[in-house]
Amino acid sequence: MKLLAALLLVTGLTISPAQAALAAPDIPVANVQAHLNELQRIANANGGNRAHGRPGHKASVDYVKAKLDAAGYQTRIQTFTNSGATGYNLIADWPFGDASQVIMAGGHLDSVTRGPGINDNGSGSAGLLEVALTVARQNVRPAKHLRFGWWGAEELGLVGSTFYVNSLTSAQKSVIKAYVNFDMTGSPNPGYFVYSSSGQPSGSLAIEDLLEAGFAAKGVPTELTSVGGRSDHAAFARAGIPTGGTFSGAEVRKTAAQAQKWGGQANVAFDRCYHQACDTSGNINVTSLDRHTDVIAYALYSLIGA
Ligand code: DPN
Ligand code: CA
Ligand code: ZN
């Protein structure tokens, strides 16, 4: 418990959530799964995918946006053009907290054309959405300003996130104090990876430590991984913004030592359906989805000073 909350408790004062330091919430994984089922339904209704330039991507954006709008977020859709098609980033601001200290969290909402992209990256997208909705439900009044991004055209080379960062003035970049990325969190043969801060902007080590502490609080061992230019934090890192993230693994195979530590199958890919048609709502390990999503909440509540 944070000191303020403890003091108020012992002095017998009644306190509202807006005044107390909130413990990080336990995000109900069933709510995250419900979002994934919607993304699967959207893919089914739109030719089997949610890819850039295809109607399933825009329908995904509209689904997430409607939930956020109803919860009180200030949302906007930023458009860009790539490969002759319009792309979409969805940006959502929780309209409270010090605007000169912005904490950002994001992930990509587009899939590859081969399949519905439920683990890659419905999982991170749905987890971020449910954490955002939890902030609204709890009516959190954070010290810092919270902003979410759901990026388009990641699968074509980090296009949407790069477009967003390039669209910011240097003043707008300098107020962003952290960016945390969630791309693949429900891998069927899961790992519990935290992005390595090595080679990342100064300030990234604190984010790495925080994400590790979030898993440690749940008794889950972690490993560091160097994601490099393989996901959307890269554009933020290039702009000098401290970054981090979590990841449950893609095409690489789980080692025997990792299977000892995390369970699952040794010598099998973390996600055998990576970028395949079989990346459906059946391609999700619910325990992994639950743990990674709870860590999103743990890290964000701490970073924003909730
Ligand atoms: N960027 C992911 C993809 O969309 O294909 C895969 C990935 C995520 C790879 C994180 C490494 C680390
Ligand atoms: Ca949970
Ligand atoms: Zn991908």
Identify the meaning behind each predicted range.
Residues 22-55, 110, 184-187, 270-277:
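N-terminal capping segment at the start of a domain
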Residues 45-46, 74, 81-85, 96-99, ...:
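Solvent-exposed loop/turn segments at secondary-structure junctions
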Residues 151-254:
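Metal-dependent peptidase/peptidase-like ectodomains
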Residues 255-306:
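His/Asp/Glu-rich mid-to-C-terminal helical/loop segments that flank catalytic regions of hydrolases
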Residues 1-21:
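Secretory targeting and sorting signals
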Residues 37, 41-95:
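A non-catalytic alpha/beta surface segment that caps or lines the substrate-entry region
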Residues 96, 131-145, 169, 301-302, ...:
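Flexible, small-residue-rich helix->loop connector segments that border functional cores
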Residues 105, 109-158, 296:
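Alpha-helical metal-binding/catalytic segments enriched in His/Glu/Asp
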